[in-house]
């Protein structure tokens, strides 16, 4: 019986070895998937560390505005001519032209092993409102509350504002207070004091203000002008331009970048003026991203996805050497080889956090190849 079994094994040794190698490859998918989960866990810890730093410095910033709001009232009259059913509404107007220029000063901060890009920026805003068109709101029984007019500027994270803001309208300084009366920026931003728009306005109403802002990674804008012009510059060498609009002109060099956008009201999906209803500006946001050029966890995650392929190819090479050269490889040796390949990804993950992905890949490769050869 034993002799018959030995003959069967010898006669089908290649097929049996192929089956063993196949099942070993399947089994080694388990540690490979565990390593992939470990990479995901480290990536989550990185995100937590980044969020912690951002929460104390300032998160990604999106700037909306300025938006001019002029309240008005509609009412009915009773038989004696007294006002009844008085309802207050708000009419919103966007500027005809807005120009924004600014420079971004990035800095890389570190928490444990994790890095995040923070920035400070000084932005200069100027633009104009032409004579406003009230035909859309003027009714028989309507009173425009021009003395209660105000401007709102949305800033997604007010913790990043570094200096008090003075809003200048037709050379009249208007003080600002934190918070917006409207929900176009989820209430985050600042609002000017009330002013008399009819008294203080002219044929061309100019505005200007400066904004010193801190944030992290991303700086975006909403194109509120009938014509929106933005110019940004920075010494960051690896910017990524994202959002609804790419720059019309950009220059990226070893010393930084300069980018220019020119956007028309036809390019977006909201009007120049409206009444009461809220508008969704988020789909029109655009700007620049200052993330680090190398995300080692993404690279490591991509590498681990090919772990099963590397294991299978390595086993195939040894199998064909065994068949063609009559060089016997014990199943335990296949197990050790597969384990060494799994250790490669652990080395890659741990070393890349210290010395960078490229050097870590080289060191891990040399180490594993040495283990297999020896």
State what each model feature region is.
Residues 34-60:
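Alpha-helical transmembrane signal-anchor/signal-peptide segments
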Residues 281-282, 286-374:
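Transmembrane alpha-helical segments that form the functional core of multipass membrane systems
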Residues 17-33:
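Hydrophobic membrane-insertion alpha-helices, especially the h-region
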Residues 75-87, 364-374:
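Alpha-helical membrane-embedding segments
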Residues 44, 48, 55, 65, ...:
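Soluble non-transmembrane domains of integral membrane proteins
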Residues 1-10:
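N-terminal Lys/Arg-rich, disordered targeting/topogenic segments
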Residues 15-20, 110-117, 194-199, 299-309:
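Membrane-entry segments of alpha-helical transmembrane domains in multi-pass membrane proteins
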